[in-house]
A protein has these predicted regions:
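N-terminal Rossmann NAD(P)H-binding glycine-rich loop of SDR-like oxidoreductase domains
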Residues: 1-22
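NAD(P)H-binding glycine-rich loop region in Rossmannoid oxidoreductase-like domains
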Residues: 43-83
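NAD(P)-dependent short-chain dehydrogenase/reductase
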Residues: 143-206
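Mid/C-terminal beta-alpha module of Rossmann-like enzyme folds, strongest
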Residues: 203, 210-268, 314-320
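NAD(P)-cofactor binding segment of oxidoreductase domains
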Residues: 54, 75-103
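Adenosine-cofactor binding site in Rossmann-like domains, unifying the SAM/SAH pocket
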Residues: 24, 29-51
Length: 320
């Protein structure tokens, strides 16, 4: 089986690389995997992307690529839509035509954040900024491509939020600032769930493949994929700083000295949803139907467990 993983240079793509490299020796029939980054294919070149798909002929496409510069997207809408909408559309068209499986990633930014409680997969999209609009367009393009039917093709769109991993992210930024300053002010009235790329990659592979590396069948559609619990940006920052101090990091600020502020006091070019909490009941039902309790344990893992492990590894590697 051929597998194409797009976005190899991003946080999620790197997590897939590490996970799959560890998994391959355990498989009897190991798949042929190619990781694709900017040096392998310019995703804005539709001809080049189609040529790559047709030449490699993947049975599984994992699209971990994305334009994620939320504020910059406000002035680069063409590029944001090219990568976040047109690229998944081309991948979906290939999957429909050749009976492949497409695993694509989307975001909480497709919602306006005005709902009370947890968003469901079929709640109305109402993105506030260009980034969210481009990701919503990608979701719709995939669904439209598959709406005509495909004998073997299937797709899953994993909506996730507040992603962090090997690369630039909120947690690493906060820890860097905590080394430089005794004064930190962090937004306290935007809520969501921090999601580790390591966690997300593992859940993704468990969803699409069995223990032998054979592709699973599943109902095509959107699935929310985040760990258990919820927090706000101030809560995440405080927990990250507290954890770093526990592991011996030299910081200039204590976790309880971080000042909470409302979002209106920290204006940004692109608006953010105030509520990014998403229900994962639909994803849970898939794993419950497979009677795989170990996978359910991973789904039920609280967000702070992975954050603690992440910060510990940063401290151990001297990156704080």
């Amino acid at each position: 089986m051929n597998i194409l993983v797009f976005g190899k240079d991003g946080q999620l793509g790197k997590a897939f690389h590490v996970l799959v490299d560890a998994l391959l020796p355990t498989l009897v029939n190991a798949p042929n995997i190619q990781y694709v980054g900017r040096s392998e294919c310019d995703l804005t070149d539709a001809i080049a992307l189609n040529n790559l798909l047709n030449q490699f002929q993947p049975k599984l496409i994992i699209n971990a690529s994305a334009y994620t510069a939320v504020d910059q997207a406000e002035t680069e809408s063409d590029l944001a839509f090219a990568i976040n909408a047109r690229v998944p559309e081309i991948m979906a068209q290939y999957a429909v035509k050749y009976g492949a499986t497409l695993l694509h990633y989307s975001t909480d930014y497709v919602f306006d954040g005005e709902k009370y409680g947890f968003y469901l997969e079929d709640d109305l999209r109402n993105p506030l900024g260009v980034y969210g609009k481009s990701k919503a367009a990608g979701e719709q393009a995939i669904a439209k491509a598959f709406s005509k039917g495909s004998r073997e093709g299937q797709y899953a769109i994993f909506r996730t939020s507040w992603v962090y991993g090997d690369g630039r992210n909120f947690i690493r930024t906060i820890l860097r600032l905590a080394k430089e300053s005794e004064d930190l002010q962090i937004i306290h009235d935007q809520f969501g769930v921090p999601t580790s790329t390591e966690w997300l990659a593992q859940v993704s592979l468990d969803f699409v493949m069995d223990a032998q590396g054979v592709l699973r069948r599943f109902p095509s559609g959107i699935y929310h994929a985040v760990p258990a619990g919820e927090t706000n940006w101030h809560g995440l920052a405080s927990f990250a700083v507290q954890t770093a101090l526990e592991f011996g990091a030299s910081l200039k600020i204590a976790h309880d000295a971080i000042k909470p502020i409302p979002a209106v006091e920290y204006p940004l070019p692109a608006p953010r949803p105030m509520n990014s909490k998403m229900s994962t009941d639909k994803l849970h039902r898939i794993f419950e139907g497979r009677c795989d309790m170990s996978k359910l344990d991973l789904l039920n893992q609280p967000w702070d467990k992975a954050v603690r492990s992440y910060v510990h590894n940063l401290a151990k590697d001297g990156l704080i």
